[in-house]
C-alpha cells in the first residue's frame, strides 16, 4: 500500500487514505476511492426515529474526521488538527514529512481563486438541488444501472466506487433503509425515509419543490406532520437550507407549513393569484407564531425573468427552485454558483467619483467575472463532486463530472452589496435629502437607474462554465463586514457601519409606512435580478392575528407582486420583545429573525447585527 495512505489509515482518516492509495490516478478516481473508503469505514448510527439517519446523527462526520466531504468545495480539511494528530502518533520524522505533503496537497484542492474584495456573500460557493423526483422514482438501483451502462472512463470508475461505498454503508445500516434507498418509493413512509437519506448525503443542502414531489406520495397519513417535524429538526440541526412550496398539493402544503417551527428549513412559498385561500391562512398562522418562514416569492415575476434572462428551455423553466438562502437554480439539472461573490457598490462609489462610477463598476465586474471563470476551471480539474454527479442530470448521460460540464445548466449568482446605500449617497451628492424606501420619486429613480445599469452590466458576462450571470441581493450576515472596510459615505452613514441588508431601505430610514417601502422596491428592475432581490421587512406581529388584518396584509403582498416585486421575507416581532431580547439575548433562545437572506436565532447573531435588526422600522397597517 502507498506509504501516505498507510499513514492516513493509521491516523483514522479513511477518506484521505483512499485518495492516496493510488495517487497517480486521475483526480476524479482518487476522490471516488476516497468516498468509497470513507463509507466502508463508517459505522452506521443506530436507528432512533422515523427517519434514517435520525436528526442527531451526521453521515459525513460520524467520527469527527479531520478530512471530510464538503458539499460545496468537495473536501474539508482541518490541516492544523491533522498535523497535531501526526505529531502525537507519528514518531518517524519521514512519516511526519509525508503527512505535511499530504496536507499541502489537500489544501491545494481547496484553493480559492476569488479575490477577497469580491467575496460578497460567498466565494465560489455552490448550493444545489439534487433530482429528488428521479431518486424517488428510480431508487439507487436505477442509478447503478445507468452508471454500469456508461462507457469505460475514469468518471465511471469513480462513480462505481462511490456507489459501492454507499451500498456497503446501507447494507450495514439498521432497519429497512437499504431497501427504501435501493428501490423506487412506494408510499409516503418509504419516500420520506429515502428522501432523508439522500438529502443527508448532500448535507441537507436544498430540497427544491419539496411539497410538489413529496405530495405525490401523501395519502392522508395521520402522522405525516410528525415525519415533517423530524425532518425539519434534522435540517435545523445540520444547518440545512432551502425548501420551496408550490401548493400543487394544498393539503400536504398546509402540513409542510404547519410543521415549520424552527429557523430551518429556510423555506419559501410560490405565491400568485391562484394560491388557495387556505394556504394564505396557513402562512399567516406560521408568521403569527413568530416564525418568519416561509418567505413569499412572486411566481409570475420569476417566470418572466427566467424567460428573458436564463438559458433554461421548455419544461425545465418550470423546475426553477432556490438553493441556500434563496438563490435561483433549476431543480435536479443545474450547477449554479451560489453565491460566487459579487460587487460592493458603496465601496466602489467611495473610491471613485460620480463621473467615473460606472466605468469603475465595469472594471470591477470584468475582474470578478475573470476570477469566477478561473475558479470554475480549477473546480473542474481538482474538485469533483461525485454525489452531485450521480444525482444531477445530465452528468451520467454526458459522462462528465458535475463541475466539468456534466450538468444541463450552469451559471453564477452575482451578489450586489450596498445598492441602497449607493443610491442614497448619489442622491445626497445631488442635494436630495430623501432616502430610498419612502416612495420618494427622485431617490427611487436614482436607485432604479443604478440597479438597471448594474444588473444589465452583470448579465453581459459569461460566468461558471460559460453560463449566465444572475444578479442578486443576498447578503447573509456579511453585510456588517461589507461595511466595515468602507469609509463614511455621502448619505450620512458613518465609517465602518454596515451596508443595507437587502434590496430595501437602510434600517430605520423607511418612515412612510409599508406601502411606501414596497412601492420603492417595486420600482427596481426585478426581472433583471432573478438571482434574487431579497427584501427584509419588519412587520407588527398583530398583522397576522386577526382576519381583518390578514386581509390587509394579503392585499399588501399581492399589490407588491402586481407591481413586479420579486420576494419578501418578514420578521414579525414587536419592538418591546425585541428590546428585551437585545438586552438579554440568552433569555430568548427561540426568537427567530430574518437576517440577510435567511432565518437565524436572534441570540446567535453578533451584537452589531442584533442592533441592526432592532433598528429596522416596525411596520403596521
Language-model-detected regions and their locations in the chain:
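Conserved catalytic cores of very large enzyme subunits
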Residues: 1-159, 186-621
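Low-complexity, highly charged intrinsically disordered N-terminal segments
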Residues: 159-162, 166, 170
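Long amphipathic alpha-helical scaffold segments
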Residues: 178-183, 196
